[in-house]
Design a protein with these regions (language model features):
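Bacterial N-terminal signal peptides that target proteins for export
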Residues: 1-9
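C-terminal segment of classical bacterial N-terminal signal peptides
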Residues: 16-25
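Extracellular glycan-recognition surfaces and repeat-rich motifs
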Residues: 28-38, 50, 59-97
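Extracellular carbohydrate recognition and processing domains
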Residues: 52, 140-176, 185-191
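Extracellular beta-strand-rich recognition modules
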Residues: 66, 119-125, 178-186
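Beta-strand acidic-aromatic groove motif in beta-rich domains, primarily in extracellular
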Residues: 75-77, 119-122, 129-138
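Short beta-strands within extracellular/lumenal beta-sheet-rich domains
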Residues: 93-120, 130
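Exposed low-complexity, polar/acidic, P/S/T/G-rich flexible segments that act as propeptides
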Residues: 187-203
């Protein structure tokens, strides 16, 4: 009887160990799949636009608030970092800067992480004109494609843009893409601030 109890206990321990090992392997596989789907480590996410009823999870892009003077960004056509933060202090109450894009100006972000399942791009904007968004997809050997992210009319004070996502899907972004760059341009005069990306355009 005691021998049978010990045998049953041993079998139970082996079964629990097997389940734990399988779970660990599944976790490793899930982590590998996530790494494969996302073009890099996007970092911590938050519901940055929750004050506007948007509960999606976004990560803050590299100098997306332009507090470091646009470090890593490339500006042309008069685009530049100026004093004056977006009025909702979305990223932080200590922020003091934003990006001005005059008519014909462009601003190109550093390489950014993204997800292949409909990445969403959102920011704050103000001014008078049209804000245009393009996405440059990069592979290991350079640019693979330039995609149209859409445009939005900007008229007045600071407000969140729509989520730019409709043409950025796994069908549009080329296989082998490792990172993206966001290219902002305008007709008129537009200010932008606090650029965020939702890697998976979570619902």
């Amino acid at each position: 009887m005691a021998r049978s109890f010990r045998l049953a206990s041993l079998v139970a321990v082996i079964a629990v160990s097997s389940v734990a090992a399988s779970a660990a392997r599944a976790g490793n596989v899930l982590g590998s799949l996530t790494t494969a789907v996302v073009g890099g480590n996007c970092g911590a996410t938050s519901a940055a636009f929750s004050p506007f009823g948007d509960q999606r999870s976004y990560y803050f892009t590299s100098d997306g608030g332009f507090e470091a003077g646009g470090a890593g960004w490339t500006f042309s056509g008069g685009a530049k970092v100026v004093s004056g933060n977006e009025s909702f202090n979305l990223h932080g109450s200590s922020d003091r800067s934003s990006l001005l894009i005059p008519n014909g100006g462009t601003a190109t972000s550093p390489a950014l992480c993204f997800g292949l399942l409909y990445p969403g791009i959102r920011m704050m904007a103000a001014g008078s004109g049209t804000l245009n968004v393009q996405v440059v997809a990069h592979g290991l050997l350079g640019a693979l494609s330039v995609l149209d992210g859409g445009s939005v009319a900007v008229n007045g004070g600071w407000a969140p843009t729509p989520v730019f996502s409709t043409t950025l899907s796994q069908l549009d972004i080329p296989v082998g893409t490792k990172s993206i760059q966001v290219v902002l341009s305008s007709t008129g005069s537009v200010q932008v601030d606090d650029l965020y990306i939702d890697p998976f355009l979570s619902r």
